[in-house]
A protein has these predicted regions:
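A detector for small-residue-rich transmembrane helices and their helix-helix packing motifs
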Residues: 1-181
Length: 181
């Protein structure tokens, strides 16, 4: 039986909401309703910058990434997935602010750091072992994106991966504690 793809809004409300939100924010920049990209390193600016895409191809790549997360949302369920997304957004924001205090980091915009966080979380939390080939592929993808696009945020992507590792380790620990009870 063929799977009904039209029901994705009901099956994946978190991915759907993020997808629409990012399109709305992009449209606000495209129409000049919003004029400046928040590149300050305070909590609100860094948090907000996750939802900004000023380039159409960057927007499309991140929207495709969000679409690919629907499998993760269906596997975890929307409540756990929302918890993961919120954890990654806030953890990456804090890491970026802390890193900027040590070394001055360039402005990073877009949802790709969060995407890398979810992909890394998925690799580490899904099985009892870590798939180093896929993890290596994420690292190579980050390096390739920086080489091919000078504006690509190496720091934002790496911080996303680190956040995904922490999220997965915390998740596995919680699952282990639950299984003991």
């Amino acid at each position: 039986m063929k799977e009904d793809k039209t029901n994705i809004l009901k099956k994946c409300p978190i991915c759907s909401f993020i997808f629409v939100l990012i399109i709305i924010v992009f449209s606000m920049y495209f129409t000049s309703a919003l004029k400046t990209v928040p590149c300050e390193k305070d909590m609100i600016s860094v948090l907000y910058s996750n939802f900004i895409h000023t380039d159409f191809y960057h927007l499309l790549a991140n929207l495709f990434g969000i679409y690919s997360l629907t499998n993760v949302e269906m596997r975890l369920g929307s409540k756990k997935f929302l918890t993961l997304i919120l954890f990654l957004i806030f953890f990456t924001t804090l890491l970026e602010i802390l890193l900027n205090k040590i070394i001055k980091t360039p402005c990073s915009i877009g949802f790709s750091g969060i995407l890398y966080g979810v992909f890394t979380f998925e690799i580490i939390s899904k099985d009892k072992y870590v798939d180093y080939k896929i993890l290596g592929s994420i690292i190579l993808n980050i390096m390739f994106s920086k080489i091919t696009n000078n504006k690509s945020s190496l720091y934002g992507h790496v911080i996303g991966v680190i956040s995904g590792v922490f999220g997965a380790l915390i998740y596995k620990k919680i699952q282990m504690l639950k299984s003991k009870n």
